[in-house]
Amino acid sequence: MIVLGLEGTAHTISCGILDENSIMANVSSMYKPKTGGIHPTQAAAHHVDKVSEVIAKAIEIAGIKPSDIDLVAFSMGPGLGPSLRVTSTAARTLAVTLKRPIIGVNHPLGHIEIGKRLSGAQDPVMLYVSGGNTQVIAHLNGRYRVLGETLDIGIGNMIDKFARYAGIPFPGGPEIEKLAKDGRKLLTLPYSVKGMDTSFSGILTSALEYLKKGEPVEDISFSIQETAFSMLVEVLERALYVSGKDEVLMAGGVALNNRLREMVSEMGREVDATTYMTDKNYCMDNGAMIAQAGLLMYKSGIRMNIEDTSINPRYRIDEVDAPWVIEKNVKYRDAGAESRIVNTDFYGRSAVKKIRIAKGYRLKELDERIRGERMKNEFTVIRRMRDAGICVPIVYDYDPFEKTLTLSQIQGELLRDVIRARPNVMGNVGHDVAVMHKNKISHGDLTVNNIIVSDRICFIDASMGKVNAELEDLAVDVYTLEDSINSLSENGKTLMKEFKMSYRANFPQANDVLNIVEDIRRRHRYV
């Protein structure tokens, strides 16, 4: 089956042609603004000028006639509206002219599926990093789920914005990578990981301040990469444990960065996960990836009429069924993204020793700082939670030099393992989170892997929590929990309804927090 795919969500218009056996052609034309970032109307004008040319060239390279095409696929979203409209119009015109079926493709889905095809990955956790997108994605329950993403700007846009202020033209990423190789001094930048999500606006603000103060651009570039990439790899590792996968795949324009590739590969070696890299020729937006996703969708029985092909600039990957994926499920025992757990004895009491292990992918200086800060913070948050009557482990010993905590054992099952069989437990979770929040305590990583269900609801691994939390911090807790539940259960809305009823009943400011949760979702410009 020969599929023609058209990509045009942002700065690139591209046509790819492939079948089940080979990629026959992939032709692209990229809009490069003379100054500043992407101007949507100018990008669309570029696509209008080039779309016929790239289609004709791709057909020529493929050595086929237009009538040989069996299916037309195009990027339906997410992306810039003007660019999407040009692409969809061209695809519809082609499909109608050739009297062939048409199918609209989710842009991130294309990145995943071309990466899998070229690398041999079967069921990976994907780190999708580009100008507008920063997401950690895995297939669970019939769909790809977004396990973590940016809460503000995409990492590629952050790098490009810094580059513009530093006088580097678009795209700035490759030049920042070159400059970073000559950097020697690690400047302190915000390390903003919130559960499974990240935030890069603080890094940009601090980096620009360093630029104004006259710090060498090489050192700033070096510090941006080391800090931002460490955040990404940390969340990626956490996603492996949450999803039960043992493969990692990288895609998107930022995935071309050799330092990021090196860090992801090192993390994979540390946790015994297989790391796959999308061929660099296909990391950037391209038509072949749209053709590949369209091929899989069509062969799985998915069909669209012309009237179903309206563009969707906010089209999320978790809205798309992906029945062709065969899921894996790996059990990681006594391990997490932050630490290793060892059963021990503390003066006759059953205990666990939580060892915050060094991360080889992080610079030693940064790693020492992060591990030390988080262990100290976990000790503080646990103590405050116990004072508030919340079930948490007892801290028997705190060793800041060895970076270990010795804690009491909590018997029970993880929420992720019981949530389907015992959905009514969510009311109890809502009650205890309300108590936590009423005492101005946030957990910081409130996922289904950090809640234990026994005769009580108990919380573990609060190393990213706060003891004088703002409403925004409390909202991130609820947002993180909701996302982790939705990623694992098709009944997420029902489960969260039980949670929210109890949360509202036991926390006077619950509605304020839940309104901020919705605001966080609206702030997700990059989907």
Swiss-Prot record:
Specify where the region named Kae1 lies, as residue ranges.
Answer: 1-324
Query: Could you tell me the Gene Ontology terms of the biological process aspect for this record?
Result: tRNA threonylcarbamoyladenosine modification
E.C. numbers: 2.3.1.234, 2.7.11.1
The main place the protein resides is cytoplasm
Q: What positions does the entry give for Fe cation binding?
A: 107, 111, 128, 285
Q: How is the co-factor bound, per the entry?
A: Binds 1 Fe(2+) ion per subunit.
User: Molecular function terms in GO for this entry?
Assistant: ATP binding; iron ion binding; metalloendopeptidase activity; N(6)-L-threonylcarbamoyladenine synthase activity; protein serine kinase activity; protein serine/threonine kinase activity; protein serine/threonine/tyrosine kinase activity; zinc ion binding
Which ranges carry the Protein kinase domain? 330-527
Q: Where in the cell is it found?
A: Cytoplasm
Record note on quaternary structure: Component of the KEOPS complex that consists of Kae1, Bud32, Cgi121 and Pcc1; the whole complex dimerizes.
Physiological role: Required for the formation of a threonylcarbamoyl group on adenosine at position 37 (t(6)A37) in tRNAs that read codons beginning with adenine. Is a component of the KEOPS complex that is probably involved in the transfer of the threonylcarbamoyl moiety of threonylcarbamoyl-AMP (TC-AMP) to the N6 group of A37. The Kae1 domain likely plays a direct catalytic role in this reaction. The Bud32 domain probably displays kinase activity that regulates Kae1 function.
Q: Which family does it belong to?
A: In the N-terminal section; belongs to the KAE1 / TsaD family. In the C-terminal section; belongs to the protein kinase superfamily. Tyr protein kinase family. BUD32 subfamily.
Q: What is this protein called?
A: Probable bifunctional tRNA threonylcarbamoyladenosine biosynthesis protein
